[in-house]
């Protein structure tokens, strides 16, 4: 006896009388379905033969047989089950069923749609009820699993007219990213595609209408991936191999980039023009007028004064170990510049110098921020970051590739330094909280007129060993490349082989500039900044265990300088030499900028590390005080603002293209550097020359309009004469012409010293005349002429005459150098032949001159 099915209503569904059946009712429904399936098999009549071009594969789960009959065997898979079967399952089993039916998509650490136990079971009960209700023959209702997904995502319950129930293939991406394919799940026949937004024809949880993107414009803009595509991929990507130390048998993944050819409307003409010859005295006069305190600056003995004077410093939790200090290795000397531009000598990492640098760079962390709810606010800042800068569609369709290839490239780069696959440490056995510390020997040139009252302090570097960095750097490099591909068109990160400061089709003239100078950027970062980075890394697709691990050993660390014997604990501040320094500084700067300013008001945004520059048509509106009150940064809005970033000015030519020009003031200072090592063949000087030429490759593009822009920007930034900047360009043109012109800027007194002190590397032979021998015999002293081992007597004896000869077979100089030395010796008229006493250097006078470096004059 067939019992009538309960009427479908929301009340019956909620009180349990509809959709939740008793075991007897379940058995009845199953038997009815078996009878209907068997009757369909008995009553089937084949249709007339029709010639079709392609066979159509039918799904075994479908009861509709438009082109063929189903199998005689009726599977139990056809029988639907009620919601009571799922009420008895655990949460894990329900989540597996949720993945099977709804088929959510994982974007970063988010499931779209999110899993809700109550909603999922209600959707199952609703689908069970809808299948029992007689439906209209006009449209075909979806099968059970797809119907559950449709109810859960609140989409259509019926198949489209043009789509069959067993073959629903819809492109889930609204715009293809060249070189990428996106498969969110391994689909079976009869699956329901994700819901599509009717307004923008995109996936519902990827469209701008959804809260994940929030802005329609963010998905409509071009990104980095639109201009650069992956040319080829070889091998298989495995993100876990980076931390598994698998060694050289890993298959590298090569990822090359190729830029789309852009149509050129006009070809810029060649602007190689003859310039006036520049005298070196003119360049020195420019330095004297532009940098008045630099012309007489000489720090040759400044560090000696620091080491020998009284020293007082106030630091907390510092450990000093002065027993096993590493002695400084003496170098072979440096080239001496002709120009005096205020450049300093190299700094030696002594204990006092390191303590002074730590005091300024690492200690005395400012406490400028207010008390805030760190978890809630850090999550809000990270969400604002993704809304302001990230194209959500590109992030969902981009792949995380090239990790293993970056790992092999890193190992190949440092192979000459002794780094090999066998020497890689086990990261789980290493204490990653310990960092090495050192100071930079090269001090950054100072452009302010304060050298007469202030001594520059060197920067510090906090770093891990190469064995540890080699395992983290490839991961962050690949993640940074993915981050670049997902940025909106207006955002530029000038780093790497592709992205640079050159912008075609963008003119910096008639634009408002916004430049934020963040002081004490590294040591001002705290727990708030670390939590922001953790949320952003998880959102970009970094594995959550690695992100958590990386942030844990950045909460508290210990730095130690072995050469100086100094150690100190630090907390959340930025490590200036690890694998995440540039990437971390960039995302922190971008997050702070997006929270203080509305990024939609800017046409271009540049974020290289801790620098930032924005261009807008209208005056920028924002609240820069939040840099201090919220993010604990000492921020200063540069006024007047000029297009200046990374020590470069941005200029636009007549064709509307923007290119970068190094700061002329800093380039002139580099011409007077005292850090070029001496070499006999000038190889180090030539390397500096090639670097100088590469930095000044813009000279061929400098028209009169560009020179006028540079002069104006130079005056606004430094409040100095812009005409001197034009004169500096003439000097650059001369010294980039050839290497011989560049050599005029440096000299070395090493060769002149070698002409005089020729006993440093050869044996000294003393021959005495018969007059001296007869005189010695009178004094009762007998010496043999051929005795080469004895040291000559006191050179200050009255009336002595010695003849010094250097054996030709042991001399390394040429005949020309020998004649020059002899002529130099003969030209000196000295009444008494003397040998410079070794007592002047604090050495016993009985030591031979060749051992103590004394100078013999005849």
Swiss-Prot record:
This is RNA-directed RNA polymerase 2a. Residues 809-818 have a biased composition (Polar residues). GO terms for biological process: DNA-templated transcription; positive stranded viral RNA replication. It is an enzyme of class 2 (transferase). InterPro entries: Bromoviridae_RdRp, DNA/RNA_pol_sf, RNA-dep_RNA_pol_alsuvir, RNA-dir_pol_PSvirus. It catalyses: RNA(n) + a ribonucleoside 5'-triphosphate = RNA(n+1) + diphosphate. It comes from Cucumber mosaic virus (strain Ixora) (CMV). Coiled coil: none annotated. Keywords: Nucleotide-binding, Nucleotidyltransferase, RNA-directed RNA polymerase, Transferase, Viral RNA replication. The lineage of its organism: Viruses, Riboviria, Orthornavirae, Kitrinoviricota, Alsuviricetes. RNA-dependent RNA polymerase which replicates the viral genome composed of 3 RNA segments, RNA1, RNA2 and RNA3. SUPFAM superfamilies: DNA/RNA polymerases. Residues 511-624 form the RdRp catalytic domain. The keyword NAD does not apply. The keyword Repeat does not apply. Residues 775-830 are annotated as: Disordered. Residues 798-808 have a biased composition (Basic and acidic residues). Its EC number is 2.7.7.48. Interacts with replication protein 1a. GO terms for molecular function: nucleotide binding; RNA binding; RNA-directed RNA polymerase activity. It comes from the Viruses. Belongs to the ssRNA positive-strand viruses RNA-directed RNA polymerase family.
């Amino acid at each position: 006896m067939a019992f009538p099915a309960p009427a479908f209503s929301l009340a019956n569904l909620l009180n349990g009388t509809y959709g939740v059946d008793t075991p007897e009712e379940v058995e009845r429904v199953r038997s009815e379905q078996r009878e209907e399936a068997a009757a369909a098999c008995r009553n089937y009549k084949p249709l007339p033969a029709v010639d079709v071009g392609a066979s159509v594969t039918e799904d075994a789960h479908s009861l509709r047989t438009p082109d063929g009959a189903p199998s005689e065997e009726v599977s139990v898979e056809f029988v639907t089950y009620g919601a009571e079967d799922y009420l008895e399952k655990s949460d894990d089993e329900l989540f597996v069923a949720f993945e099977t039916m709804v088929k959510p998509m994982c974007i970063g650490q988010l499931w779209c749609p999110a899993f809700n136990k109550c909603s999922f079971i209600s959707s199952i009960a609703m689908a069970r009820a809808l299948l029992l209700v007689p439906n209209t023959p006009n449209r075909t209702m979806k099968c059970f699993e797809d119907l559950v997904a449709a109810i859960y995502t609140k989409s259509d319950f019926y198949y489209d007219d043009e789509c069959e129930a067993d073959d629903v293939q819809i492109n889930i991406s609204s715009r293809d990213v060249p070189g990428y394919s996106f498969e969110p799940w391994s689909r079976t026949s009869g699956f329901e595609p994700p819901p599509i937004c009717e307004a923008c024809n995109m996936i519902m949880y990827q469209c701008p209408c959804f809260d994940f993107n929030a802005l329609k414009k963010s998905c409509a803009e071009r990104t980095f991936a639109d201009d650069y595509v992956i040319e080829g991929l070889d091998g298989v990507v495995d993100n876990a191999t980076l931390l598994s130390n698998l060694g050289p048998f890993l298959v590298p993944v090569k990822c090359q980039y190729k830029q789309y050819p852009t149509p050129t409307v006009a070809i810029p003409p060649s602007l190689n023009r003859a310039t006036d010859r520049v005298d070196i005295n003119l360049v020195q006069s420019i330095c004297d007028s532009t940098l008045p305190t630099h012309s007489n600056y000489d720090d040759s003995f400044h560090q000696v004064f620091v080491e020998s004077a009284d020293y007082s410093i106030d630091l907390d939790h510092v450990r000093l170990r002065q027993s096993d200090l590493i002695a400084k290795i003496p170098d072979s000397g440096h080239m001496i510049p002709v120009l005096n531009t205020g450049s300093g000598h190299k700094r030696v990492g002594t204990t006092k110098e390191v303590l002074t640098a730590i005091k300024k760079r690492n200690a005395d962390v400012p406490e400028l921020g207010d008390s805030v709810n760190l978890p809630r606010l850090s999550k809000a800042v990270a969400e604002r970051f993704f809304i302001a800068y990230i194209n959500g569609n590109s992030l969902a369709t981009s792949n995380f590739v090239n990790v293993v290839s970056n790992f092999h490239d890193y190992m190949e780069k440092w192979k000459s330094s002794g780094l090999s696959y066998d020497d890689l440490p086990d990261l789980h056995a290493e204490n990653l909280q310990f960092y090495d510390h050192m100071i930079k020997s090269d001090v950054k040139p100072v452009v302010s007129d304060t050298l007469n009252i202030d001594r520059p302090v060197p920067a510090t570097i906090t770093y891990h060993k190469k064995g540890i960095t080699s395992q983290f750097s490839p991961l962050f490099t690949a993640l940074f490349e993915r981050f670049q591909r997902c940025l909106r068109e207006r955002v530029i990160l000038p780093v790497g082989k592709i992205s640079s400061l050159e912008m075609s089709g963008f003119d910096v003239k008639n634009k408002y500039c916004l430049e934020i100078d963040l002081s004490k950027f590294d040591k001002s970062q705290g727990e708030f900044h670390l939590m922001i980075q953790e949320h952003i890394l998880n959102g970009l697709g970094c594995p959550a265990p690695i992100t958590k691990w990386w942030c844990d050993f950045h909460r508290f660390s210990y730095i130690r300088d072995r050469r100086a014997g100094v150690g100190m604990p630090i907390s959340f501040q930025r490590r200036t030499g690890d694998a995440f320094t540039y990437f971390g500084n960039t995302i922190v700067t971008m997050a702070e900028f997006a929270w203080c300013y509305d990024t939609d008001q800017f046409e271009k945004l540049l974020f290289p590390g801790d620098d930032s520059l924005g261009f807008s048509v209208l005056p920028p509106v924002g609240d820069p005080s939040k840099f201090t009150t919220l993010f604990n940064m000492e921020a200063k809005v540069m006024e007047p603002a000029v297009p200046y970033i990374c020590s470069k000015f941005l200029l636009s030519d007549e064709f509307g293209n923007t290119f970068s020009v190094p700061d002329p003031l800093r380039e002139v200072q580099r011409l007077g550097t005292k850090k070029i090592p001496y070499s006999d063949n000038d190889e180090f000087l030539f390397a500096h020359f090639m670097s100088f030429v590469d930095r000044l490759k813009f000279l061929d593009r400098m028209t009169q309009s560009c020179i006028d822009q540079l002069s104006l920007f130079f005056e606004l930034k430094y409040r100095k004469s812009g005409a001197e900047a034009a004169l500096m360009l003439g000097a650059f043109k001369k010294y980039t012409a050839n290497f011989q012109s560049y050599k005029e800027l440096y000299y070395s007194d090493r060769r002149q010293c070698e002409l005089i002190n020729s006993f440093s590397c050869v044996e000294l032979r003393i021959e005495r005349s018969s007059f001296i021998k007869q005189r010695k015999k009178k004094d009762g002293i007998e010496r043999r002429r051929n005795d080469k081992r004895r040291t000559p007597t006191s050179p200050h004896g009255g009336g002595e005459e010695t003849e010094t000869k250097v054996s030709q077979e042991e001399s390394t100089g040429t005949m020309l150098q020998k004649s020059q030395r002899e002529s130099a010796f003969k030209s000196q008229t000295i009444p008494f032949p003397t040998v410079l006493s070794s007592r002047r250097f604090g050495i016993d006078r009985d030591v031979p001159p060749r051992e103590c470096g004394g100078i013999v004059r005849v």
